[in-house]
A protein has these predicted regions:
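Condensing-enzyme catalytic core mediating Claisen C-C bond formation in acyl metabolism
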Residues: 1-50, 154-236, 240, 244, ...
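Anion-binding (especially nucleotide phosphate/pyrophosphate-binding) glycine-rich loop
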Residues: 70-105
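Claisen-condensing/thiolase-fold acyl-transfer catalytic domains that form or cleave C-C bonds
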Residues: 55, 59-62, 85-86, 99, ...
Length: 336
């Protein structure tokens, strides 16, 4: 018997403004609403208001979690915040969230900058903190506002991404079998340029030059200040890295895909998910697809897809895989 972290509660939050396929079709005459749904699997996406940040969304998700009554703010002894949209270069947004949420001051709190793999990385850190006795209850917040990085006429990415946040409570349990893990990680910085906001950091500060908008071969508009995604390269990376990571995880867990009640992958797009499901030969009833109403919410797609499974309280063995920007990826087993 040992101490393990376990996912015991999840709550998500979506900003109020909704961007529908009809809204997008009005901007892109060659893309009717049904074509956008067919291509992306997304019907609507939620968009943060001007002045509404990832920190605001994360706060709302955490407050929704506390409202479930399972845990109080004073019970949290470590805060992990995954975002690529901090309020400030410094201080760390997790410190701002500690104060806003009324958490104790004798806790650990930090941000980490990952995208689509971030939730699984966050689970691994929570598990390490709990198994080593450094924390009993870890609050993992994931939030992003990619809408603020996307040029309105870059239809490829604008149709896919939505803003949102999730709050996940990982709690210590005494158990024979760890409720989190094993984990498999992957990193390949040679793909960094395929999903990137080139300007705005210290390598390439924003200037009048970086704000110059150009049109690509597909008619999408963007500048160096905006998000760029090489969809074809991302697809190739995903179809190679994800099945390989799953094979590695299954070997470590001594399991087959049939042993899992649910397979929850990062909800990149309906097209990528369908390709992966077929490649992995997972039946549709055990393969979670949850992006129609909110799109690709980056680090929050997996917890948002898990939320109904955690809420219904039925014990399940689930396989989680996050993958994307970096390139960064991670796979994990979780017992709910």
């Amino acid at each position: 018997v040992g101490t393990s972290g376990k996912i015991v509660a999840i709550a998500s939050h979506l900003p109020g403004r909704v961007l529908s396929n009809d809204d997008l079709a009005a901007l892109y005459p060659s893309w009717p609403a049904d074509k956008i749904l067919d291509k992306t699997g997304v019907q609507t996406r939620h968009i943060a208001a001007p002045g509404e940040t990832a920190v605001d969304l994360a706060q709302a998700a955490a407050e929704a979690l506390f409202a479930q009554g399972r845990v109080a703010p004073s019970d949290i002894d470590y805060l992990l915040f995954c975002t690529q949209a901090p309020d400030h270069i410094l201080p760390t947004s997790a410190c701002i969230l500690q104060r806003r949420l009324g958490l104790r001051t004798d806790i650990g709190a930090l941000d980490f900058n990952l995208g689509c793999s971030g939730f699984v990385y966050g689970l691994s850190m929570a598990q390490a903190l709990i198994a080593s006795g450094q924390a009993r209850r870890v609050l993992l917040l994931t939030a992003d506002t990619y809408s603020k990085l996307i040029h309105p006429m870059d239809r490829g990415v604008r149709s896919l991404f939505g803003d949102g946040a999730a709050a996940t409570l990982i709690e210590a349990v005494e158990t024979d079998t760890p409720a989190l893990g094993p984990f498999v990680f992957g990193t390949d910085g040679s793909g960094a340029e395929n999903l990137i906001v080139p300007a705005g950091g210290f390598r390439q500060p924003r200037t009048a030059q970086t704000a110059v908008v150009t049109e690509d071969a597909s008619g999408n508009l963007r500048s160096a200040d905006h998000l760029y995604m090489n969809g074809a390269a991302i697809m190739t990376f995903t179809l190679g890295a994800v099945p390989a990571a799953i094979d590695k995880l299954l070997a470590r867990a001594g399991a087959t895909l049939d042993d899992y009640d649910a397979v929850v992958l990062h909800q990149a797009s309906a097209f990528i998910l369908d390709r992966l499901r077929r490649k992995l030969a997972v039946p549709e009833d055990r393969f979670v697809v949850a992006l129609r109403d909110w799109g690709n919410t980056v680090s929050s797609t997996i917890p948002m897809a898990l939320e109904p499974l955690v809420r219904d309280g039925r014990p399940r063995r689930v396989l989680l895989v996050g993958f994307g920007v970096g390139y960064s990826w991670a796979a994990a087993q979780a017992l709910l």
